[in-house]
Amino acid sequence: MLNHPQLIDLLKKAYSAEKAAAFAYQGHAASVKDEMEKKEIRQIEIDEWLHRKEVLQIMNDFNISISKHYELKFYIIGKVISASCHIIGWFMPFYFAGRLESGNVCEYFRMKQYFNSIGISTYDKMLYEMGIKEKEHEIYFLEKIKTNKFLPYYEKYFSWGNNQSFNNIDLDKKYIFRSREGIYWFLFSLKNKFRALFL
């Protein structure tokens, strides 16, 4: 039994939100003309389905039920976004996908913090890897639009772009942490103090 209401809700929400993201990427991949972009976005969709599966594994470990409310809510959101990708042009799907992924990075590190606060470190490696994968997604989308003429205007109003992010992870550096299974390397660092990652 997991006695942490915030963590339970975060797990339920993440599980359903990953489905919304996967649906959105289905529409995004279908809307682009470049075959390489289609392939890359479809791989990101696969990553989201895998994350959903991994979150469910954690939920099952604690007999946490799936939220019907979140499932319906994010199903609708995902399908609406998927359809909209065909009518809003090339730039906007890439921009808002990157912005979304930027925030998702923090969610998995927040899960780790919550687990650690109640003495559980079993999922440290999994949650780090999921957070890092979301960061890789963010960087992919940003690289696609970083020189686009619309980006400065969107960044000004939506607070994400070349100069702003919703996390402070740097994939060019490494951090080591120990777990019961040994030492693991992860390709990230903090621009500020390590503890700031979990605020």
Residue ranges of each PLM-predicted region?
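Non-heme di-metal
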Residues: 1-199
